[in-house]
Swiss-Prot record:
Role of this protein: This protein binds specifically to 23S rRNA; its binding is stimulated by other ribosomal proteins, e.g. L4, L17, and L20. It is important during the early stages of 50S assembly. It makes multiple contacts with different domains of the 23S rRNA in the assembled 50S subunit and ribosome.
PANTHER family the UniProt entry points to: CHLOROPLAST 50S RIBOSOMAL PROTEIN L22-RELATED, LARGE RIBOSOMAL SUBUNIT PROTEIN UL22M
Example GO biological process: translation
Protein name (Swiss-Prot/TrEMBL): Large ribosomal subunit protein uL22
Database matches in PROSITE patterns: RIBOSOMAL_L22
Family: Belongs to the universal ribosomal protein uL22 family.
Keyword Transferase on entry: no
Highest classification ranks of the organism: Bacteria, Pseudomonadati, Pseudomonadota, Gammaproteobacteria, Vibrionales
């Protein structure tokens, strides 16, 4: 039994979000929530929200017992990139890349 939750177009770069995703991969949901709660990273807040949604999906849609769930899969894909311009000296301009992410979490029974 598996339950999936996604956060598409999350406003954080995939590189930063993957640092947090790697910390909770394969852990039980209780342990993962504890790790995310005490993490100081912005991505931890986003990943925690998706994990809580996946747990709720498992409980509501599949009738799963929360105590038996673990993070089976978690991955962060690259979303669209907004390109912005920052003016520089002597009429030049630099390109700013505002990256976004698609965060996907699959929880399953142990």
């Amino acid at each position: 039994m598996e339950a999936i939750a996604k956060h598409r177009f999350a406003g954080i770069s995939p590189q930063k979000a993957r640092l947090v995703a790697d910390q909770v991969r394969g852990k039980s949901v209780d342990q993962a929530l504890e790790i995310l709660t005490f993490s100081n990273k912005k991505a931890a807040v986003l990943v925690k929200k998706v994990l809580e949604s996946a747990i709720a999906n498992a409980e509501h849609n599949e009738g799963a017992d929360i105590d038996d769930l673990n993070v089976a899969k978690i991955f962060v894909d690259e979303g669209p990139i907004m390109k912005r311009i920052m003016p520089r000296a002597k009429g030049r301009a630099d390109r700013i890349l505002k990256r976004s992410s698609h965060i996907t979490i699959v929880v399953a029974d142990r």
